[in-house]
Amino acid sequence: MAGGHKKNEATRQTDEVIQQKYDESLSKHKNRCELSLTFEYKLSNKLRARLKAAFFKVDHGWEDQTLDQVETLVRKENHVHRRSRSINDLDSSKLRRPHHPNSIMGSNTGKLRASSFTRLVSPREGFAQLPYKKPVSPYSSSSAVSSTSSSFDRTSPPWLNYVEPHTELPRLPFELSHASTASAKSPLFGMNYHISRPEETDESLRLGTANLSRIRKSTSLPFPTAYPLSADDCKAAEVMLTLVNSMPSKKP
């Protein structure tokens, strides 16, 4: 048993050595093939270049010069040509103008470029050319408000021209006496709207006038003016008052 085991071990070691040697020889052969291919490739390129130099020599009548001299001259010419082509490419890229849809055959590109540069450097200069309107103070005079609104009407849409009336009252078919700042202690509290009737007595008119003058002095606000009524308006007011008085009052 021991002899057989040793024999198998020796056989296994021999196989490993053989496999290792085979791998080494295979890698060497592979490297040799790669080197030969590289050498052949370089040699073929060199032969091809010398063949071109020979044709170039014959075409230009340089029979008195060797192939090495011709290759040197060709290499210099190629270098100069490559350099001049790169310079021409740079010049053409500098002269190339960007296309703009609003320009006709690129005639306005200089102006557009200058205006865009100005906007980038100082963007506020573009806003300085726009029409500027000073905002109107809420406490300014009525003339200034009217002039501003008239100028605003010409340049703004219709829905911006509406101004809520603060100082005018609607016209009614009868006279109104309105105290807008009446408080709980005011004699007109609870009856802010007073309809003047033709049947009122002189005493009530006198009391109402005294109360109104007292309120005007205390509040120092302009009292709304009364509009004159026509005969038809007076008749309509009388009919309304008659209807109101004819309604039955609730007894306590």
Swiss-Prot record:
Its main location: cytoplasm. One of its GO terms (biological process) is negative regulation of transcription by RNA polymerase II. Belongs to the WHI5/NRM1 family. This is Cell cycle transcriptional repressor whi5. The lineage of its organism: Eukaryota, Fungi, Dikarya, Ascomycota, Taphrinomycotina. One of its GO terms (cellular component) is cytoplasm. Residues 1-23, 84-110 are annotated as: Disordered. It comes from Schizosaccharomyces pombe (strain 972 / ATCC 24843). Residues 1-15 have a biased composition (Basic and acidic residues). One of its GO terms (molecular function) is transcription coregulator activity. Has a role in meiosis. It is found in: Cytoplasm; Nucleus. The keyword Repressor applies. The keyword Nucleus applies. Keywords: Cytoplasm, Meiosis, Nucleus, Repressor, Transcription, Transcription regulation. It comes from the Eukaryota.
